[in-house]
Amino acid sequence: MPEKEKDPQDPLREILAMLEREIAERPPTIGVVGVSGVGKSSTINSLFRTSLATSGTVARTKEFEDVDLSVRFNAPLAADSSEKSSGPGESPVAPQTNAPTRVLLRVVDAPGLGEDLALDDRYLEQYLENLPRCDVVLWVMSARNRAIALDQMYLQKLSRFYDKIVFGINQVDLVEPMDWHTGYNIPSREQEANIKAISQDRLEHLASAIGRKPALLYYSSRYGYRLEHLFKALLDACPENRRWIYAGLKNFSHLDFIPAETQQKLVFRATRRLAQMLSKSDHR
């Protein structure tokens, strides 16, 4: 009896199953930290369409809280063995189109530092205990608060995590003269100039504190402004030995969390298109 021909997709399925097992055992994990009142939980809610408790008057997060999300993952698969192998001096054969699946993305919401001196030691212990399991850490700051001495002080105590920190300046919609263009979801010219001045000032102070130029982005969790830039910066900051996991998330953005019916609305499409045009002009 002739031997049954093997399905060429079997090895690919095995690879995909192996990737899924690895991710299930140690899911990609993003920590969100910072001093109290800067909008950490609201940032998570805006980025990932969650519903963590938030408050503008009292601190809500008292312990590290894991938020588990199911997201699309494009697993990189090897090139089809039937294709011609590349010879000496030739470019390597391009991999097959990625195979989409669903995986767990873990977001860790941290209690705010600086809320109460009596709590700081306990919170710092929690930071030291939980941050090692995070692949990348978003350190949230507020655009409204020019004083960053607290951030600098806590950063000194968490120096072992510098390599995995991305700094985010939240609440830019509240920067003077507070004339945000809600119809287009962009700041006014004067407001944008002030936002960029604040960002440059923070960049210089943070570079002085950690001894290197940090990854820093400004955004508004309230309006969802520049969240896609923020999310991609987090993916880019992942550790090298975990990069293969985050490479599968590269084609995924915060827009994937927005319901399809919302994305089809004319105002939403127009706003997104305008944001893309402005983003391109910023990089010219």
Show the residue positions of the predicted features.
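Canonical P-loop GTPase G-domain recognition
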Residues: 173-248
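Switch II of P-loop NTPase G domains
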Residues: 79-137, 141-157
